Amino acid sequence: MGAYRYMQKLWRKKQSDVMRFLLRVRCWQYRQLSALHRAPRPTRPDKARRLGYKAKQGYVIYRVRVRRGGRKRPVPKGATYGKPVHHGVNQIKFARSLQSVAEERAGRHCGGLRVLSSYWVGEDSTYKFFEVILVDIFHKAIRRNPDTQWITKAVHKHREMRGLTSAGKKSRGLGKGHKFHLTIGGSRRAAWRRRNTLQLHRYR
C-alpha cells in the first residue's frame, strides 16, 4: 500500500486516539485564524488529490470556517407577513449543506479563481472547517493541460454559486443510485413535471 492509502485509513478512524488529539489541536489552531484564509498546503493531501488537486502552480487551497446550526430567517423583530404557515423564524433549515456555503464564500472572496471542490477538515461544537480547492484558470500550467482545460471554459464561471460542484449537486439531489431517484430527468422540478403531466397519445 502507498502512503496515501495509510493516510486514508487514518482519516477513516476519527475516534482513534491519534485523530482525536490531532483534530482537537487543529480545531483550536483554526479558531485563532480568520474565517477565510489561504492554507500553505492541503491538510489532507490524499483527499485533495482524489478531488483533482495537484501540487503545482495554478492550484490554491483556502480554509473556510462556517458556523454550525440552522438558519434563522432574517426578518426585523420576527415580523413575517402572509399566512401563518410561513411565519416561522427560528427552526428554519437551510436547503444547502454547510460545505456548499464554504465553497460559495471562498468563490466570492477569490472571484478570479474557479472552485474545483472541497473537503471536511474538522469541526467543534460551534464551527465546521472545510478546505476549498481553487484553480487559477489564467495560469499556463492549467490552460495548456488537456486534463484541466475544461474548467477554463466560460460555462464554469462561479460554478459553486449554481450548484455545479460535488457538494452543490448533492444538495440538489443529483447522483446515481436509488437514493437519487427523485431527480431522474435532470432535476426535482423536471421529474415532478413529467410525473404530473397528463399525456394522451393519439391512437394509431
Curated annotation (Swiss-Prot):
Gene Ontology CC terms, in alphabetical order: cytosolic large ribosomal subunit
Protein name as catalogued: Large ribosomal subunit protein eL15
Sequence similarity: Belongs to the eukaryotic ribosomal protein eL15 family.
Function: Component of the large ribosomal subunit. The ribosome is a large ribonucleoprotein complex responsible for the synthesis of proteins in the cell.
Organism: Tachysurus fulvidraco (Yellow catfish)
Disulfide bridges in this chain: none
Subcellular location: Cytoplasm
Quaternary context: Component of the large ribosomal subunit.
GO BP terms in the entry: cytoplasmic translation
Keywords linked to the UniProt accession: Cytoplasm, Ribonucleoprotein, Ribosomal protein
Record Gene3D superfamilies: Ribosomal protein l15e
GO molecular function: RNA binding; structural constituent of ribosome
A Pfam family matched in the record: Ribosomal_L15e
Cited InterPro entries: Rbsml_eL15_core_dom_sf, Ribosomal_eL15, Ribosomal_eL15_CS, Ribosomal_uL23/eL15/eS24_sf
PANTHER family: LARGE RIBOSOMAL SUBUNIT PROTEIN EL15, RIBOSOMAL PROTEIN L15
